[in-house]
Amino acid sequence: MATKARVMYDFAAEPGNNELTVNEGEIITITNPDVGGGWLEGRNIKGERGLVPTDYVEILPSDGKDQFSCGNSVADQAFLDSLSASTAQASSSAASNNHQVGSGNDPWSAWSASKSGNWESSEGWGAQPEGAGAQRNTNTPNNWDTAFGHPQAYQGPATGDDDDWDEDWDGPKSSSYFKDSESADAGGAQRGNSRASSSSMKIPLNKFPGFAKPGTEQYLLAKQLAKPKEKIPIIVGDYGPMWVYPTSTFDCVVADPRKGSKMYGLKSYIEYQLTPTNTNRSVNHRYKHFDWLYERLLVKFGSAIPIPSLPDKQVTGRFEEEFIKMRMERLQAWMTRMCRHPVISESEVFQQFLNFRDEKEWKTGKRKAERDELAGVMIFSTMEPEAPDLDLVEIEQKCEAVGKFTKAMDDGVKELLTVGQEHWKRCTGPLPKEYQKIGKALQSLATVFSSSGYQGETDLNDAITEAGKTYEEIASLVAEQPKKDLHFLMECNHEYKGFLGCFPDIIGTHKGAIEKVKESDKLVATSKITLQDKQNMVKRVSIMSYALQAEMNHFHSNRIYDYNSVIRLYLEQQVQFYETIAEKLRQALSRFPVM
């Protein structure tokens, strides 16, 4: 009898990931409980099949009755975890932000149905972005042989972090940036990743905001901005506003993953060696350190720069060789992205992450980063464009143009991911089997011919046999080929999917600031602000616009380089693949003489 399971939490599938949308209380049939990576395959009453997080369902008894059981739930431990105090706090936070959950996993839902009018109109941008916030982890076992295709499909939910913080790591966030703010505005979307509450119950990630972002008025209406020590200049180049790039660039090599343990072996983890190419001096970091860096970058720069989430960690089977290889590959890609960004790579927190000399220096730098006041919208106070102020109409047009392009690109990237996933499944499943069937059929025919006893057909029978073996070889080539070309195309698209998922929140911050400026006339009329305050607001929104344009120019230059490189590689490998097949077929053909 097929195993049944009751869905414990709502789960919204992402396009292109072979996932199945399920709702709390729904009964599904488990068709494959051993997918791996914290996933199982299920079928709903409509006959639709797809992946569902293991911890989102409860296995029902064999009689099919839905009764409470402490012994058969896949998520028993998750249920017990929910009783912890940390979960109680997270649940309280989730309840207070419940209005932001309804938009699901599509960060562009508010863009498609945007409101107009008052200041709250852009609140819909609070949908969880896939890249910097609600995007589920991008990392799972690199199980190439699975029927579900490319490993990016297994974007499992964040699991309980058994790689707990050491005692030397601060508990509560010390930065004032994490304090609740009643002035959270359109830019106050909860961009934080589930890692902020990774020790709590494994429920839908978008129920836990990572932080509460102060409203843009903190920046726009500040009477006098302090002169920060750090400056982020913006210049006007051939293609418009741009960040100032350092004279020498560097990359960071992530290598040598090693398994470590603590507490007499009760806790285990993977540690990576990071070597910046500009110093060639290595430092070691565990995954939780990467997680800390991601959070600090998101908090500090997330209002202006897209910070894609890390490949998430996994608990079950996380030390499998293929999984470690895949996660290291994606950590490498993430670090390379950060190194290539002229603002991120030069930031104090990033440099400290790569160049600390000892434990004391690491702890000091860590605490300093967590107390950084120039975070969120206040990052714009450090930016100095070398250009005249823009008028509000132009600012709004630039913002709309960025929103439209990133939304359209997000759709295009998801479509390519979906098509690529389907193609991967065909290449690793049905297609090789068809070639194998042809090969076996030809060899069977040759065996039948050989049984005739006729002396003059030996050459023909041998040729048919070799042709059959050729098709079996082609089957193997077809099954292996996606790892040589499609994999890299999928990974590139997956990276950009993460980037694009950050933009609704960034655009929301800018749209909110624009709305504030539009309201300034009323505030001046009612003597709530002065005319000078209004002029300061316009100037500061202009700075925000220059920052957005500079970031988009950086984004476009990287996009052109990346897609040119990855599609060129894909086509080169495809040409080589078909040439190899053609050569094998020519060799098989040469055994058949013209008669």
From Swiss-Prot:
Among the GO biological process terms of this entry, one is: positive regulation of actin filament polymerization
Residues with the modification Phosphothreonine, per the entry, are 216
Record PTM N6-acetyllysine, positions in chain: 288
Signal peptide (residue range): none
Kindly give the SMART domains that the UniProt entry links to this protein. Answer: PX (SM00312), SH3 (SM00326)
Post-translational changes noted in the entry: Ubiquitinated by ITCH.
Q: GO cellular component annotations, sorted alphabetically? A: clathrin-coated pit; clathrin-coated vesicle; cuticular plate; cytoplasm; cytoplasmic vesicle; cytoplasmic vesicle membrane; cytosol; extracellular exosome
Q: Any idea where this protein resides?
A: Cytoplasmic vesicle membrane; Cell membrane; Cytoplasmic vesicle, Clathrin-coated vesicle; Golgi apparatus, trans-Golgi network
User: Where are the compositionally biased (Acidic residues) regions?
Assistant: 160-169
- Protein residues bound to a 1,2-diacyl-sn-glycero-3-phospho-(1D-myo-inositol-4,5-bisphosphate): 286, 288, 327
Which InterPro entries does the annotation name? AH/BAR_dom_sf, PX_dom, PX_dom_sf, SH3-like_dom_sf, SH3_domain, SNX9_BAR, Snx9_fam, SNX9_PX
Q: Where is the composition biased (Polar residues)?
A: 111-121, 135-145, 191-201
Membrane topology, as annotated:
Peripheral membrane protein
Query: Function, please?
Result: Involved in endocytosis and intracellular vesicle trafficking, both during interphase and at the end of mitosis. Required for efficient progress through mitosis and cytokinesis. Required for normal formation of the cleavage furrow at the end of mitosis. Plays a role in endocytosis via clathrin-coated pits, but also clathrin-independent, actin-dependent fluid-phase endocytosis. Plays a role in macropinocytosis. Promotes internalization of TNFR. Promotes degradation of EGFR after EGF signaling. Stimulates the GTPase activity of DNM1. Promotes DNM1 oligomerization.
- Assembly and interaction partners: Homodimer, and homooligomer. Heterodimer with SNX18. Interacts with ITCH. Interacts (via SH3 domain) with TNK2, WASL and ACTR3. Identified in a complex with TNK2 and clathrin heavy chains. Identified in a complex with the AP-2 complex, clathrin and DNM2. Interacts (via SH3 domain) with DNM1 and DNM2. Identified in an oligomeric complex containing DNM1 and SNX9. Interacts with FCHSD1. Interacts with ADAM9 and ADAM15 cytoplasmic tails.
In the record's own words, the domains note is:
The PX domain mediates interaction with membranes enriched in phosphatidylinositol phosphate. Has high affinity for phosphatidylinositol 4,5-bisphosphate, but can also bind to membranes enriched in other phosphatidylinositol phosphates.
Family according to the record = Belongs to the sorting nexin family.
Specify the protein name. Sorting nexin-9
Give the species.
Homo sapiens
* Upper classification of the organism: Eukaryota, Metazoa, Chordata, Craniata, Vertebrata
